[in-house]
Regions:
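Pyridoxal 5′-phosphate
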Residues: 1-312
Length: 312
């Protein structure tokens, strides 16, 4: 039997074995509620603190700027809705037309509540032009949200320049980095990122857990009501096992980021060579500056059966 090759790692990734093993104690013996004041909660509470440090280090943030969530969708919704409701004098949001539906639908939601949203159109390679942002942003803009890398074609956006323009008008800058984190270097301080969304299952962590980086000083309202978890900003008992697994997976990926990128680019080039040799008429989509391994191609006048030629 031939080895199975999963070719949709932009949709999800396999759970890292080390991350899985790191989760086990928190699912078995150390199952205490980290929010409680007694001794049995101390180890889970410490595990959350250590996980925050690990994640923060990967993106050059402070541990107290990391807020655990259920994943990228919640993080995006929190960034959009929490920002829209926090300052009535700055109501406008600017985003792009190629964002993930988690963010686009969150924007549609605030539009229904009277908050204006402007959608920027990228160029043919999926790049959002900073000059286009400069042309539409005003001092009434509260938030600019542009994804770090597109999940369909892999294009990496000019994040630092877009953030600079946002800040020049007093706006905060959010990026959905779900597809980018652990695959390309991210420095939230150097890039001027105020908020960043991430999801563990995109970097070999468990599903159902993620985080939102919120720069110290950014005003954001809680998305849900309940207990005082996550510094009083995100109610709900913390999923300690998954958070620990996420931190371990991110630590492993970030420590080998350059090595992994080099390996994946070799595989990417090998696949493209194979496609050229197949005789299929195709074009590569996206920009030269893209996430390693994210390959988008369009085929001319080809039916599904022809694609098997590539692998035989």
């Amino acid at each position: 039997m031939k080895q199975f090759i999963y070719a949709d790692n932009a949709a999800t990734t396999k759970l890292n074995k080390e991350a899985f093993n790191a989760m086990i104690p928190w699912l078995t013996d150390e199952y205490g509620n980290a929010s409680q004041p007694y001794a049995f909660a101390r180890k889970p509470k410490k595990a959350l603190a250590e996980s925050r440090k690990i994640i923060a280090k990967c993106i050059n943030a402070l541990p107290e700027e990391i807020y655990f969530t259920s994943g990228g969708t919640e993080s995006d919704n929190w960034a959009i809705k929490g920002s829209a409701s926090s300052d009535p004098d700055k109501r406008a949001t600017i985003t792009s037309a190629i964002e993930h539906h988690a963010l686009l639908n969150a924007c549609a939601s605030i539009e229904r509540h009277g908050y204006p949203v402007t959608y920027l159109s990228p160029d043919s390679e999926g790049t959002v032009d900073p000059e286009q942002l400069s042309a539409v942003i005003t001092d009434r803009t509260r938030l600019v949200s542009i994804m770090f890398s597109n999940n369909e074609i892999g294009t990496i956006e000019p994040i630092a320049e877009l953030a600079r323009i946002a800040h020049s008008h007093g706006a905060i800058f959010h990026t959905d980095a779900v597809q980018a984190i652990a695959h390309t270097p991210i420095d939230v301080k150097a890039m001027g990122i105020d908020m960043l969304s991430a999801s563990a299952h995109k970097f070999n962590g468990p599903k159902g857990v993620g985080f939102l980086y919120i720069r110290k000083g950014v005003e954001l309202r809680p998305l849900n009501d309940g207990g005082a978890q996550e510094f009083g900003m995100r109610a709900g008992t913390e999923n300690v096992a998954s958070i620990v697994g996420m931190a371990k997976a991110l630590e492993i990926s970030c420590s080998a980021l350059n090595e992994n990128a080099e390996h994946i680019l070799k595989l990417e080039n090998a696949l493209l060579e194979r496609l050229k040799e197949s005789g299929l008429d195709f074009v590569r989509n996206g920009a030269r500056n893209h996430i390693p391994g994210n390959i988008s191609v369009s085929f001319k006048d080809a039916d599904g059966g022809q694609f098997f030629i590539v692998w035989t």
